Each structure stands twice: as structure tokens, then as C-alpha cells.
Amino acid sequence: MKVKVQTLDAKASGDIELNDEVFAVEPRADILARVVQWQLHNRRAPARAARERSDVARTGKKFGRQKGGGTARHGDRRAPVFIGGGKAHGPRARVFESSLNKKVRALGLKMALSSKAKDGKLVVVDTLELKDAKTKALIAKIGKLGFGATALVIDGEAVDNGFQLASSNIHTINVLPAIGANVYDILKHETLVLTRAAVEKLEARFNG
């Protein structure tokens, strides 16, 4: 698959040949859903347990007499009705992490990249280097390139520092190095922007 490459000034900068095994895989909703769910499960922090009645370190002695005291028929001070007592039906400790086969994860990433290419939402730029690392200047360039409502920009080994600084105040743009490319973030944004270096890194990731 051949795609046109642009500069940040929206000028033509030649073409790039994309590997069909990475950027032309037929997307499957079930695979993409499994990978996204796996990502979100692993992002979730473990649930902490609350101390229930049996977990509270308080006396087990009966609170007052059963009859004749003029009060409720309480058992011990660990009951949920007392301050310092246990929690009634409290949350238990739970870890939400799940596992997913490496091949399925790799296939999901290929499908996410391919879905953007198929929908015409893939933009390839030559480099992210900015002469003037200012937010105002970057917004003007983005308008010419047509990034859409939201864009995920992926660079090579590391994101260009000037571009990262200039884009940090633009809430519709997120940037990642190639190693951080993932299905959830790609699908979450309307447009996927790759540099030449990012394309090389992503293709090497699957071929290596």
C-alpha cells in the first residue's frame, strides 16, 4: 500500500510503501474488543477490601443485657451500627488483571492500524521537528493537515521534544513513541498520524 507523505507545513514529501501485513489486515470487531477489554482491565487498580464484622479488632463481649436495659438487643461492638464497627457487605479484595495471548494482541494492533488506513484516517508526516515550538504555530499547521476532531500522533524512538511541548496545551492531540502504540488509544482518536520513523518502528515490531 502506497501512501503520500507530507511535511508539517502540508507540503508533499514523496510516498511511503506500507506493509500490507501490518496496514491492510481486515479488521474484526471481536478481536479489537478483546484487546481493548484486556487493556482496560490491566489499567484498573486493584480493589481494596473493607473490614467486615469478623475482621474488626474489638471485644466480642455482649453489649449490655438482653432484657431489662431499655436499649436495643445488641450483640458486640463489632456490629456495623456502631462507630468503629465492621462494614456490612463491604467490598472484598479483587485484582482485575487479565491475560491475553500475544498473537491476539499483535493481531489487534495490526487491525487497529489497518482500520485507520481503510477509513482514510491515516496521515503520514515526514518528521515532527518544529522550528518554532509554539502552540499557536502548531495549531495553524494542524489546520492545514486536517487532523480531524482528535488525533493520536506517533513518532519513532522518542517523540520530538519541541512537538511535545507545543502540543501539550492542545487537548485534542495526544503523542506517543512507537513503542507505546496500542489499540485503545488508536481507536479512541479520529485520526492516526505517523512519522516515517514510526512506520519503520511499527513494521519492525511485527517482523522482528
Swiss-Prot record:
It comes from the Bacteria. InterPro entries: Ribosomal_uL4, Ribosomal_uL4-like, Ribosomal_uL4_dom_sf. Residues 49-58 have a biased composition (Basic and acidic residues). Keywords: Ribonucleoprotein, Ribosomal protein, RNA-binding, rRNA-binding. GO terms for molecular function: rRNA binding; structural constituent of ribosome. GO terms for cellular component: ribonucleoprotein complex; ribosome. Residues 47-84 are annotated as: Disordered. GO terms for biological process: translation. Gene3D superfamilies: 3.40.1370.10. Disulfide bonds: none annotated. One of the primary rRNA binding proteins, this protein initially binds near the 5'-end of the 23S rRNA. It is important during the early stages of 50S assembly. It makes multiple contacts with different domains of the 23S rRNA in the assembled 50S subunit and ribosome. Belongs to the universal ribosomal protein uL4 family. Part of the 50S ribosomal subunit. NCBIfam families: rplD_bact. This is Large ribosomal subunit protein uL4. The lineage of its organism: Bacteria, Pseudomonadati, Pseudomonadota, Alphaproteobacteria, Sphingomonadales. The gene is rplD.
